[in-house]
Swiss-Prot record:
Superkingdom field: Bacteria
InterPro entries: Integrase-like_N (IPR017856), TACO1_YebC-like_2nd/3rd_dom (IPR048300), TACO1_YebC_N (IPR049083), Transcrip_reg_TACO1-like (IPR002876), Transcrip_reg_TACO1-like_dom3 (IPR026564), YebC-like (IPR029072)
A Pfam family hit: TACO1_YebC_N
Lineage: Bacteria, Pseudomonadati, Pseudomonadota, Gammaproteobacteria, Oceanospirillales
One MF term in the entry's GO annotations: DNA binding
Key words of the record: Cytoplasm, DNA-binding, Transcription, Transcription regulation
Entry keyword Transcription: yes
Taxonomic source organism: Alcanivorax borkumensis (strain ATCC 700651 / DSM 11573 / NCIMB 13689 / SK2)
The protein, known as: Probable transcriptional regulatory protein ABO_1803
Principal place of residence: cytoplasm
Length: 239
């Protein structure tokens, strides 16, 4: 599963405009998590992890507080998750995760990004079977065996552990996320996670031509411009 977090999703924080989009997307995700599971991060583990990740990505506190306050109010929009998939430039594959209050609008917007870049949107399962849905934890630790033992003692299904000069990357099935994180924290204290989330990781990467890369960049830009898009995963080798 190497290079898991190198291509995990398109960078969205290169300009102030992009940062605003990152804040908006975190705000929406925090609102949805708090509304469905409660606004107390100590009781809502999904919300707690999301807030921690938002802070790591330098999302301002007022953005987080606004989303929580909105969820406390009980009103507001009703967002539901949606996932689209298909083939991108050069035969590449893409998965697009959305949160939407209007599925018809969102599908039309995503389909337009595919159509305008000569890509092909597919039905559910078209390319998702070529991605692994995994929980990933990246943190500094010298003893790989101790980490594996702690996870196994907690009955966590560990898919793989990679060690890059003392920086460990732990992969588990996505359904093991909370159990794995709890086991790591209980065994080693409050670890400083560089990556701590659930992602879709391609089973293999593809190299595309310079011409296709230009179209791929346009494809990614169009998707990232859509307010409803939360994450874009692909199998293009950007190295």
């Amino acid at each position: 599963m190497g290079r898991a977090y190198q291509n995990r999703k398109e960078s969205m924080a290169k300009t102030s405009d992009m940062k605003a989009k990152v804040y908006s997307r975190y705000g929406r995700e925090i609102y949805v998590s708090a509304k469905s599971g409660g606004v107390d991060p100590t009781a809502n583990l999904a919300l707690r992890s999301l807030i921690e990740r938002a802070k790591k990505d330098q999302v301002p506190g007022h953005v987080i507080d606004k989303a929580l306050d909105k969820a406390k109010g009980g009103g507001g929009e009703d967002y539901s998750p949606a996932r689209y998939e298909g083939y991108g430039p050069g035969g590449s594959m893409a998965l697009i995760e959305c949160l939407t209050d209007n599925p018809n609008r969102t599908f039309g917007d995503v389909r337009m990004a595919f159509t305008k870049t000569k890509c092909k949107i597919g039905t559910q399962g078209t390319v998702s079977h070529m991605f692994d849905h995994v929980a990933i934890f990246v943190f500094a630790h010298e003893d790989e065996d101790a980490v594996l033992e702690a996870l196994m003692d907690a009955d966590v299904d560990v898919s793989e552990i990679e060690n890059d000069n003392g920086m460990l990357t732990v992969f588990t099935p996505n359904t093991e996320y909370f159990k794995a994180k709890q086991a790591l924290v209980e065994a080693f204290g409050e670890l400083e996670f560089e990556v701590d989330e659930i992602q879709f990781i391609p089973q293999s990467y593809t190299t595309i031509s310079a011409e296709d890369m230009d179209m791929f960049d346009k494809f990614m830009a169009m998707l990232n411009d859509l307010d409803d898009v939360q994450n874009v995963y692909h199998n293009v080798d950007l190295g």
